[in-house]
Amino acid sequence: GLANSSTVTRGRLSGFGGAPNMGHDPHGRRHATPAWLNMITEPDPMQRGKKLVVQMVETFQAGVKPTFVETLDAVEVAKTSGMPLAPVLIYGDDVTHVLTEEGIAYLYRAESLEERRAMVAAVAGITDIGLGVDAKRVAALRQSGKVVYPE
């Protein structure tokens, strides 16, 4: 429910393709781009922007398998294969937006881990994660513009 993702699933261990480019964490930036600047949430000359990392997924995969889960399959794969860490492609705290057929969650605007989880749930449809969020909470997130549904 925190927007972590991996290409590793039970029965399938695939590579990360171009994702190793995500493997660095540079906080400094010589030339700010408009997209990078748009990720700034507080007016402060020392505030930093953020790389846009947008997850675009359907709430369910083939075979009615939910995309949004509490624990990635990669965690179990790591345990059973003796890996020291789960092979996570992108950690949720790097994800700025989650876009599904339900709507978009502007995760970079979350003010807490709890709010981030609620924002993911708000666009997770009828998955267990999506059904775990209160309708009043979703309404408040929509009112604040942190979650937007198609009209």
Please name every model-derived segment:
Residues G1-E151:
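Conserved phosphate- and dinucleotide-binding cores of soluble alpha/beta proteins
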